[in-house]
């Protein structure tokens, strides 16, 4: 639903969110990776990396989004912008993965199909 209704999704997030791209292509070494959804927030002056997962939150998801956030910070973010924030939207949250995640820039949220 999110990728098919990006305008609605972005408007539900609140003020200041701007769509940058979905399946946003980045090159890590000799391989391409794709960020599910990349936004920019003009109020917070930072990029927002969003990863969509159809499973319970796993520690591998944290590592994946950290790589994407670091890539954006090192290759796209301007010097006057704040560090990138990551949001993982997953079928089921896992409080233990979040508890032991050392990066407070990452937020996990559950979704429900209606």
State the predicted function of each range:
Residues 1-114:
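Charged, terminal alpha-helix-loop-beta segments
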């Amino acid at each position: 639903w999110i990728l098919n209704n990006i305008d609605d999704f972005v408007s539900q997030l609140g003020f200041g969110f701007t769509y940058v791209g979905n399946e946003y292509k980045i090159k890590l070494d000799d391989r391409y990776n794709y960020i599910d959804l990349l936004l920019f927030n003009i109020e917070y002056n930072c990029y927002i990396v969003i990863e969509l997962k159809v499973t319970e939150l796993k520690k591998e998801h944290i590592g994946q989004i950290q790589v994407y956030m670091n890539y954006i910070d090192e290759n796209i973010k301007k010097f006057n912008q704040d560090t990138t924030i990551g949001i993982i939207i997953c079928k089921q949250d896992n409080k233990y993965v979040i508890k032991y995640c050392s990066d407070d820039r990452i937020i996990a949220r559950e979704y429900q199909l209606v």
